[in-house]
């Protein structure tokens, strides 16, 4: 019979949490006119990339989404990329 205490247990895998790229001392400001910065947070299809992928905090993700939508409305960013 196998003793449960003799079976080696795996150590739990802890993924290191990424920090928000917009928080910190020299972090860039989110501005709707900064098209190059906003394009990094848009997929190749033109959709806003979720914060679980980009590691942006919830507050900054809302600011980012608002800036992207504002830039789209003004014609600085495309709505859809084909």
From Swiss-Prot:
Q: Pfam families, alphabetically?
A: Ribosomal_S18
Q: Does the keyword section mention rRNA-binding?
A: yes
What superkingdom heads the lineage? Bacteria
Q: Does the keyword Nucleotide-binding apply?
A: no
Q: Name one GO molecular function term.
A: structural constituent of ribosome
Note the InterPro entries from the entry: Ribosomal_bS18 (IPR001648), Ribosomal_bS18_CS (IPR018275), Ribosomal_bS18_sf (IPR036870)
User: One of this protein's GO BP terms?
Assistant: translation
What job does this protein perform? Binds as a heterodimer with protein bS6 to the central domain of the 16S rRNA, where it helps stabilize the platform of the 30S subunit.
Family per UniProt? Belongs to the bacterial ribosomal protein bS18 family.
Q: Which NCBIfam families match?
A: S18
Name this polypeptide is given: Small ribosomal subunit protein bS18
Designated gene of the protein: rpsR
